[in-house]
Amino acid sequence: MAHKKGASSSRNGRDSNAKRLGVKRFGGQYVKAGEILVRQRGTRFHPGDNVGRGGDDTLFALVAGRVEFGNLRGRKAVSVIPTPVASE
């Protein structure tokens, strides 16, 4: 293998694409079932009531309702408070 760089080459220029992590729905917002609430690596936020956790630790709403952030046994958690459905 060459140990000299050669004309106009560089050892830099590698970077990963942004992963678009973070909170997607904030406290007080209304969501439908299945909507993504938080994209994360690891469990920065834990699933609370009516919230599921995907294989990549993504939190999503299990029911339609209002998003609420709070503490669950000393950990940050996200819950969804179901909204009563008006009967037609």
Swiss-Prot record:
State the superkingdom: Bacteria
Stored InterPro entries: Ribosomal_bL27 (IPR001684), Ribosomal_bL27_CS (IPR018261)
Which residue ranges does the record annotate as region Disordered? 1-21
Extract one GO cellular component term from the record: cytosolic large ribosomal subunit
Coiled-coil segments: none
Matching PROSITE patterns, A to Z?
RIBOSOMAL_L27 (PS00831)
A single Pfam family it belongs to is Ribosomal_L27
Q: Which HAMAP family does the entry link to?
A: Ribosomal_bL27
Can you name one GO molecular function term for this protein?
A: structural constituent of ribosome
Q: What is this protein called?
A: Large ribosomal subunit protein bL27
Report the family membership.
Belongs to the bacterial ribosomal protein bL27 family.
Organism name? Thermobifida fusca (strain YX)
- Supply the alphabetized keyword list: Ribonucleoprotein, Ribosomal protein
- Biological process according to GO: translation
